[in-house]
Amino acid sequence: MFNNSIHKVSICIALTLTFSANAMAVTEIPFWHSMEGELGKEVDSIADRFNQSQPDYKIVPVYKGNYEQSLAAGIAAFRSGKAPAILQVYEVGTATMMASKAIKPVYQVFKDANIDFDESVFVPTVAGYYTDSKTGRLLSQPFNSSTPVLYYNKEAFKKAGLDPEQPPKTWQELAADTAKLRAAGSSCGYASGWQGWIQIENFSAWHGQPIASRNNGFDGTDAVLEFNKPLQIKHIQLLSDMNKKGDFTYFGRKDESTSKFYNGDCAITTASSGSLASIRHYAKFNFGVGMMPYDADAKNAPQNAIIGGASLWVMDGKDKETYKGVAEFLQYLVKPEIAAEWHQKTGYLPITTAAYELTKQQGFYEQNPGADVATRQMLNKPPLPYTKGLRLGNMPQIRTVVDEELEAVWTGKKTPQAALDNSVKRGDVLLRRFEQANK
């Protein structure tokens, strides 16, 4: 009996050691991101399902603040030897990441892990933003790509005598509609999130105008800014005039206007297509989604939208097993059913052709009118060399400059021309600084 007890104890110890060894064998992969609220919940859900699908790797999502904060945290962590394996970085951080010497290109990650990966699965206009201009190879993996869209309150439109199925197509129509909406009781006619991205960068591309020389920086770091031209000045003047009348309200530099919209304060907002998840969740009224307005007097408009959002960068300095786990997770993200679900639940673009086709086959766009607006904007016309995106060094800082100058317009301290001229002047100083640092 005594021997039998010893035998049972030995079995228990052996099983405990086995389970402990298995637990220790799991490779944890930190994934720093900037998805909060409903978006963060979906990131957690995807990570959990990947973790349950295999026994070797555990993705650990960690929210690290907004895009600017997470980029700064990621670079600082790399310098101290404590970087995550995966870092989500917004699109204007691309040039910074390329020059940082802190990354391992995605194509190299897959190659080293001996995992086949077809880069052609991505929608070309999305992948093109994150590829090496010289080799055409993918440096980071597209994840949450977006374009700006127009959200409008159908009930407010109906109350103002406007057609709730017809959002404004031009900026001139939007200006007229907001006046009617305000007269009908809306405290805020129009507001915009991400003013630099929407009112300067995407406005320029949507009208076939370059943001900078050298094809918006794709052809070299010696680019200069060019968004202080008559069409852009005219547009900011229109917004300034609306602001003085009380028809356009400025709430902040990021996506503050989104909550003002879904709370019912603002009748119209332009915001990221990725805001759709929050608007769906919180809005207690019928709303619609329309394309970005264009200037009625501009020739050949609209052209195409350029993407925002972010991609996933793999940080350098990790071990072989970590990189294999990273490769498997990135491969998991582009499975048609996973990529399609992410697109459908969040409002971000379908990043692969297969995800787009699957979404159509499932009847999602028919059941959710407006859900395909972001995609249609991106594919509206074949992109010109200077409307496929932008790759400018110190772009996060340039956006801050643009924000400061536009805020001077909204407060009446500067004219649109003076603000855009100074934005270009100050921005070019930042471009030259980046160019010198990366020669």
UniProtKB/Swiss-Prot annotation:
Cited Gene3D superfamilies: Periplasmic binding protein-like II (3.40.190.10)
Residue positions binding sn-glycerol 3-phosphate: Y67, E91, S146, S272, G309, Y348, R399
PROSITE patterns: SBP_BACTERIAL_1
Any Pfam family: SBP_bac_8
Keyword Lyase: no
Name of protein: sn-glycerol-3-phosphate-binding periplasmic protein UgpB
Species in which this protein is naturally found: Yersinia pseudotuberculosis serotype I (strain IP32953)
Family annotation (NCBIfam families): PRK10974.1
Recorded name of the encoding gene: ugpB
